[in-house]
C-alpha cells in the first residue's frame, strides 16, 4: 500500500479552498448574457469553445492532490445540479465558492463548524420556501420560449423552437438534440409511436417514389415469436380479407414460407399487408410489444399468456388510424387504445424510472414513456463550423432542460434577482447561538454572488448593482446585463426556472457545508522516482568479459 500524505485543519482547508477557487474562477466567467467563452484543449481535433459551466468544470484536473479534492467537490456540485435541473451549473458553482470562502473565514476565526453548517441549512430552507411562494406558473407558449431564449444565452430562435417542440410532443415527449449537416437549425417532429424497425421485404412498399408502405386504418397483429408458416392463421387472414382493411404484422421475424405467401398475396392484390420485426431485444422487446398493444388496443399473441395463433380473432388485434413504414422506421399514428389504459401504462413506466439506478435503463424507459405519451421531436443544430455547432448544441441542451424545469416548477425573476430578494426572508430567522447566526449570515451574503458575477461579467461593479437592486422594493426589479439597464425582469422576459435556482442553492450549500466542516485530508503521496541508472547498468556489462564460456 502506498504511503499517504495527511493534512490537518487550517493547512487542509487552505489547500481545499485554493482548488475550489481555481475551478470556480474558470467556470464563473461564463455566467450571464455577457459571460465569456472558455477554450478547452482536446487531445485530438480543434479546441472546444464553450459557455457551459459543467463542461468547463468536468475538464479541470489539478496537479496538487489536495487542491484537486476541493476542485472535484465543486465539480460534483455542477454535475449534480446538471443532472437534477439540467441548467444552473455556473450559478451553483458561484454559490458554492461564496459559501466556502465565507465559511472558511469563520472557522479560522474560531467558530464551531457544525453550528455554522446548521445555520447554513436553516437559511437555505427559508430561501427555498420563499422561492416557492414567489413562483409563477408557466401557462403560455411565449413564456416557455422566453425561458429557452435566456438559457440559450439570448438566442430567440432556439427558445422559439423548444417552445414549438414542447407544444407538439407535450411535456412527457422526448426532445432530442442532434448536430445538423448544414447551417440551418431545424425542428423535426414525429407524432405517434415510432420504433427503429422497417419493412421485412421491399415488396410491401405501397409508394415506390418515397419507398414507404402506407397503411390506412389497419389491423395490427402483435406476435412475440417468429412466423415461419401461415397455416395456423389462415382463418384470421380470411376474416381480414373480408373486412377489406390492411394488416400489419409485428413479429420477432417473418421468414421462409410465411414471408413468401404474404408477398405473393400482396402482389396479387388480394391482401393489403406489411410485416416488420419487433423492436428491442430480450425483456425490453416484450415490454415494447406490450406498449404497442396498449397503444393500439390489441393483445400480444404470446404462448406465455396461453394464446395461440389458431385461436386469434379480429378483436384481439390492435387498430390505428395510420401506419407509415420506411426502410428503417415504423410509425403508428393515433392508436385505438383506451386513454385510461395508456395513462396507467405511463404511470407504471414513471414508477420504474424513479426506481432504476442505471442511466441507460432510465434513458430507455423515458424513450418508451415519450412514445406512449406524445411523440418525439428532434432539434437539429446547424452552424458554419464544427466548433460552432458543438457550442450551439451545448446551449440548446441547456435551454431544453431549463424549459422543462420551468414547466415543472414555474419561474422566478432571473439575473440573480430571485435569490437576492429571497435573502430578505432570512432576517426573520431565529438562531440558537451566535455561530448559527453567522452561518445564516454566510448564506445572506452568498446569495448575492450570482447577481454580482453577472454584473461583473458585463463590465459593471457588482456591489453597486446589487445594492441598487435591493434598495428597490419591487420584487421583479433587477439589472439587465444585456442592455445595461435596470428594469422589471419578468416583463423584460428575464426569468429563471424555480427548479434550477432551488437546485443550484441546495447542491451548493450541501457540498460547501461539507468543505467547511473538513478537519483532515488524506491523499496518496507521490512516489519519488528513482534516478534512471542506464549508464551504471551498462558499465556493469564489462564484467561479461571475465566469464568462462
UniProtKB/Swiss-Prot annotation:
GO terms for molecular function: ATP binding; ATP-dependent protein folding chaperone; isomerase activity; unfolded protein binding. Keywords: ATP-binding, Chaperone, Cytoplasm, Isomerase, Nucleotide-binding. InterPro entries: Chaperonin_Cpn60_CS, Cpn60/GroEL, Cpn60/GroEL/TCP-1, GroEL-like_apical_dom_sf, GROEL-like_equatorial_sf, TCP-1-like_intermed_sf. One of its GO terms (cellular component) is cytoplasm. NCBIfam families: GroEL, PRK00013.1, PRK12849.1, PRK12850.1, PRK12851.1. Together with its co-chaperonin GroES, plays an essential role in assisting protein folding. The GroEL-GroES system forms a nano-cage that allows encapsulation of the non-native substrate proteins and provides a physical environment optimized to promote and accelerate protein folding. Forms a cylinder of 14 subunits composed of two heptameric rings stacked back-to-back. Interacts with the co-chaperonin GroES. This is Chaperonin GroEL. It comes from Acidiphilium cryptum (strain JF-5).
